[in-house]
Every structure is written in C-alpha cells, then in structure tokens.
C-alpha cells in the first residue's frame, strides 16, 4: 500500500492530478497474482463451448474437453490453496471443494458467450492508465517535476500489484497446516473420538494434544460449533468496538434520508445496474453489468469482479481489498456502506456514484 499512498500524496503536488485521475492510473495494474488468477479462469472458460450446464459434475466425471480439464487441473494444482475466507484454517480449500471455482468458470462461460470480454476490459483499463499517466506527466510545471512524476507513476504501476504476494504465500502455509490437522482429524474420527474430521478446527493445540491422549472433548466441540454457526448467521458486524463493547456508530446522529446510501468513495465513476446481493461467492451468479453488493471481500471473491460493473460493500475503507481491486478493474465502488446487504434488495436497480461515495435506488 505504501507506493499507492505515496502516489496519492505526491502526485497532486507535482502535477495537480486529482483523485479521479489517480484512480485511472491505478487500474489495469500488472504483476498481481490474484488478478492473473482471475484472468486465467476467464481464459479457461472461453474453451468450454455452448454447453455449460452441470460443469461440476462433468469435471468430476472428466467429461470436458481435454484442454479445459488440463487447464482446471493445473489451476487447482497451483491455486487450490485459496478460497473465500482463506485465512481461517477451518475453511475448505478450492482443491478440496472445487465447486466454487467451477461455478465461476460456468458463469464466465455464459457471460463470455453473451459478448462480454473481461480480459479485453482489463487490457483496456491498462491502456487507459498509460494514456492518463502520460497526460498527467505532461502537466508538470518543469522538467524535474516531470521526470519525478514519470518515475513515480511507473514504479507504482510496476510494484502495486505485488501487494497480494505476501498473503498469497501466507495462505500456502495455512493450507499446509490445514492438510496436516485434517489428517489428524481423519484418524481421530476413524477411532470415534470425534464425529467429523473437521472437528479438530474447534480445538486449540493443547486441547488437540489432550484429545490425542484420550480426553473427551466432544461436548466442547459441539458448543463451539453452535457458537460458530450462530456467528455465521450474524447480519451486522461492527466496524469498530470500544473496550466496553459499545459500537460508536450507533451513537452518531443519523441524517435524514435523501434516498441514497452513504459510504466512502473507493473507485471513481458512475454506473447504473442490477444489484446482486452476495454473501457467499460460491453461490453468486453475476451477469455483465450487475453491481456486486457484499458485506466485505477477500481474494477469494475477486473472480466476481470480472463481470461486475460496480461494487457496494458494507465494510472497508479506500485501501481495503475490495476498494483496491475495484480500482484495478476500473469499476466504480463505494465501501463502508452500513447495512448495504439488507437495505439493497437483490434484483433492484441501483446507481453507484463512486466519486461521491453514494448509492441511489
């Protein structure tokens, strides 16, 4: 994030570039492993052909064109450690349950057949970014400022995408830990000490050691599963809590409604489309032009950005994952919109004003 923050601070002083222009420069960023992963899935989808039904079953039955099977196998071998909510060691990886990946590929195949070209759109964003960078540099008041601005723009575009790499590598470690823990869980489930191999993820290491030594933690596991499932159903997640449990946002004076939801500008531009409220990316079905409305996103969600025309997110700020990816894909985005997934109805037509940080419906 440091190169982007440096660009946002220095470029306006050097060239009088505004926020919208900086957002254009930050679109179509290269060297982003997550973006490359998304575009790879898109390319695979374009080889499936017109029949895209029951893709998961056909993949598991090996009933797909050879190049598609090879592409999916290779993708899962290299990126199968990823998933939505991937920093939780208890969440199954794509390699264990490829349904989410195959659902995305199926959706890509449908939208590609409808004339939508996500790869071309990303390339167009990169080209527009280069044009904007040249325009910004040309406005520099002197040669020294111009050289520094050009250097800054080039370095940021070359380096910003690498911000995903540390987490990508960290998740490799989490996935490896999951494999080992689940192997222990499988053995314990086989002896009847636990009901399910995944029960081990509801214990800490000390408790797991006790279980291996013969302790009975089935009641503890059941209690924690109940709490976990209850928390998964929670509709509202506070962005900030005080030490006494108070949520500061509930103490703020609520302004009269003007027919719009208010949040933080994350990616400039204005777009009108059909809202798709998504809480589980594995169950999402986005058509080209749809606006993604979500509680929050992580890299496991980013394949959805290839078909979305805008983003509304309940959590996060201008430098959150969803905001950054929206800028890279050149789609308007508003983040930090309280209760967006409940106040916006799936299928409703909404307008996202990325620059103003508002959503109208």
Model-flagged regions — what are they?
Residues 60, 80, 238, 263-273, ...:
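Glycine-centered flexibility motif
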Residues 23, 85, 187, 258, ...:
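Short, flexible coil/turn micro-motifs enriched in small/turn-prone residues
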Residues 248-291:
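Phosphate-handling DNA/RNA-contact segment within nucleic-acid enzymes
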Residues 1-265:
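Contiguous hydrophobic, helix-prone segments at protein termini
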Residues 179, 226, 256-257, 261-263, ...:
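Residue-level detector of functional hotspots within protein domains
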Residues 195, 201-203, 209, 262, ...:
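Generic, ordered loop/turn and secondary-structure boundary motif
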Residues 275-290, 295-361:
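Acidic, glycine-rich flexible loop/linker segments
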């Amino acid at each position: 994030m440091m190169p982007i923050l440096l660009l946002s601070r220095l470029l306006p002083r050097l060239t009088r570039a505004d926020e919208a222009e900086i957002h254009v420069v930050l679109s179509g960023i290269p060297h982003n492993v997550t973006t490359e992963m998304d575009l790879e899935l898109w390319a695979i989808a374009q080889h499936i052909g017109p029949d895209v039904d029951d893709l998961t079953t056909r993949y598991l039955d090996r009933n797909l064109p050879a190049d598609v099977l090879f592409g999916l196998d290779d993708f899962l071998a290299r990126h199968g450690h990823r998933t939505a909510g991937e920093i939780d060691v208890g969440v199954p990886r794509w390699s264990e349950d490829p349904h989410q990946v195959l659902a995305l590929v199926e959706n890509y195949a449908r939208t590609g057949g409808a004339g939508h070209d996500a790869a071309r759109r990303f390339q167009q964003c990169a080209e527009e970014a280069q044009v904007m960078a040249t325009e910004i540099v040309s406005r520099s008041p002197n040669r020294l400022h111009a050289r520094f601005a050009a250097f800054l723009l080039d370095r940021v575009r070359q380096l910003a995408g690498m911000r995903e790499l540390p987490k990508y590598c960290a998740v490799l470690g989490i996935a490896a830990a999951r494999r080992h823990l689940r192997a222990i869980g499988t053995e314990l489930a086989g002896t009847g000490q636990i009901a399910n191999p995944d029960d081990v993820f509801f214990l800490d290491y000390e408790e797991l050691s006790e279980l291996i030594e013969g302790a009975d933690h089935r009641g503890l596991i059941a209690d924690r599963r109940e709490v976990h499932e209850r928390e998964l159903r929670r509709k509202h997640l506070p962005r900030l809590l005080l030490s006494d449990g108070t949520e500061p946002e509930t103490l703020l004076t609520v302004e009269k409604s003007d027919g719009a939801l208010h949040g933080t500008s994350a990616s400039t531009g204005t777009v009108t489309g059909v809202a798709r409220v998504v809480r589980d990316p594995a169950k999402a079905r986005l058509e080209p032009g749809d606006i993604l409305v979500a509680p929050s996103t992580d890299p496991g969600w980013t394949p959805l950005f290839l078909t979305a025309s805008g983003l509304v997110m309940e959590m996060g700020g201008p430098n959150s994952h969803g905001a950054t990816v929206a800028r890279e894909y050149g789609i308007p985005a508003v983040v930090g919109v309280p209760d967006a997934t409940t106040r916006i109805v799936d299928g409703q037509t909404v307008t996202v004003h990325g620059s103003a940080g508002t959503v109208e419906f």
